[in-house]
């Protein structure tokens, strides 16, 4: 149970409300155009976590009335065949968005695969063109997890402008784009990574701490200042069956002002942000007569 003084950032409740809005919008669009947004999902191999995430995305599509096309490929698929499939999706007028579930097998060049996706269908927001637009504050598809984090903070009226933000993790998927969104919102941002000597130096002075590296209990209560906003993006499956984040929740919630739970925090916001991007892609394509 959360401490009485801390506010839980309930990503599940917010995502549920956004899904209701998306479902309503899609119903109106379908009635007017006789078309529905369609998300293409490519899954390579049988990684259990990837299968779980893909199934969650498909179920979310079903809840809002969005079509999907799932391609499950053998782990030994060649880059050429994978690129050919992406090319087909790029030119298919019935496909609104294309998503390649990561991680990919080692023999596949992930960078090349992501660059092969049409930027106008890159609903994951990983294409270099969309990342470049993010950096220059131009309209683009935002990576789903950072987008979800920002929406969650906005919903709870958490001020970012002028605040000190510490981001733990510098991945291309979360840390880097999230740091840019925070910077664009007027924050002073510090990004910590594997070579950072003393993470506490940054977290103890931060108004907002975001962490997503996959290490249970990495962030302790002693590493935070009282009243800090703590956004836990980590997902860790423990041997006892529990799912936890990167934050020592039971102790951190005693000093934090706001904190996301795991699960039902950032995770649901990631998925609903992906759906939002897919709807945006669909609407843009319809305006262009695609």
UniProtKB/Swiss-Prot annotation:
Q: Which InterPro entries match?
A: Aminoacid_DH-like_N_sf, NAD(P)-bd_dom_sf, THF_DH/CycHdrlase, THF_DH/CycHdrlase_cat_dom, THF_DH/CycHdrlase_CS, THF_DH/CycHdrlase_NAD-bd_dom
- Family annotation (NCBIfam families): PRK10792.1, PRK14191.1
Reactions listed under catalytic activity: (6R)-5,10-methylene-5,6,7,8-tetrahydrofolate + NADP(+) = (6R)-5,10-methenyltetrahydrofolate + NADPH; (6R)-5,10-methenyltetrahydrofolate + H2O = (6R)-10-formyltetrahydrofolate + H(+)
Query: What interactions and quaternary structure are annotated?
Result: Homodimer.
The EC number on file is 1.5.1.5, 3.5.4.9
Q: Which Pfam families match?
A: THF_DHG_CYH (PF00763), THF_DHG_CYH_C (PF02882)
Q: Which UniProt keywords apply?
A: Amino-acid biosynthesis, Histidine biosynthesis, Hydrolase, Methionine biosynthesis, Multifunctional enzyme, NADP, One-carbon metabolism, Oxidoreductase, Purine biosynthesis
Protein name as it appears in the record: Bifunctional protein FolD
Q: Name one GO cellular component term.
A: cytosol
Q: Which GO terms describe its molecular function?
A: methenyltetrahydrofolate cyclohydrolase activity; methylenetetrahydrofolate dehydrogenase (NADP+) activity
Involved pathway(s): One-carbon metabolism; tetrahydrofolate interconversion
Q: Respond yes or no to whether keyword Signal is given for this record.
A: no
- Highest taxon above the source species: Bacteria
| Role, per record | Catalyzes the oxidation of 5,10-methylenetetrahydrofolate to 5,10-methenyltetrahydrofolate and then the hydrolysis of 5,10-methenyltetrahydrofolate to 10-formyltetrahydrofolate.
């Amino acid at each position: 149970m959360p401490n009485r003084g801390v506010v839980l950032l309930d990503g599940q409740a917010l995502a549920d409300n956004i899904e209701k809005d998306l479902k309503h919008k899609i119903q109106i669009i379908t009635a007017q155009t006789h078309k529905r947004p369609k998300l293409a999902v490519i899954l390579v191999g049988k990684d259990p976590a990837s299968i779980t995430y893909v199934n969650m995305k498909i179920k979310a599509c079903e809840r809002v009335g969005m079509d999907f096309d799932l391609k499950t490929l053998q782990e030994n698929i060649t880059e050429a065949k994978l690129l050919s499939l992406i090319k087909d999706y790029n030119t298919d007028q019935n496909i609104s968005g294309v998503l390649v579930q990561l991680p990919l097998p080692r023999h596949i060049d992930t960078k090349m695969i992501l660059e092969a996706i049409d930027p106008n269908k890159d609903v994951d927001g990983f294409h270099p063109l969309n990342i470049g637009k993010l950096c220059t504050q131009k309209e683009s598809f935002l990576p789903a997890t950072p987008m979800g984090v920002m929406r969650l903070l906005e919903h709870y009226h958490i001020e970012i402008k002028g605040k000190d933000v510490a981001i733990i993790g510098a991945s291309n998927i979360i840390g880097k784009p999230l740091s840019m969104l925070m910077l664009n919102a007027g924050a002073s941002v510090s990004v910590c990574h594997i070579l950072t000597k003393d993470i506490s130096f940054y977290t103890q002075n931060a108004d907002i701490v975001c962490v997503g590296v996959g290490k249970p209990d990495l962030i302790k209560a002693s590493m935070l200042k009282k009243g800090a906003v703590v956004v836990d993006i980590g997902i860790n499956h423990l041997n006892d069956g529990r799912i936890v984040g990167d934050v020592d929740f039971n102790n951190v919630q005693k000093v934090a002002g706001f904190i996301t739970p795991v699960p039902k925090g950032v995770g649901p916001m990631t998925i609903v942000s992906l759906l939002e991007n897919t709807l945006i892609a669909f609407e843009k394509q319809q305006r262009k007569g695609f």
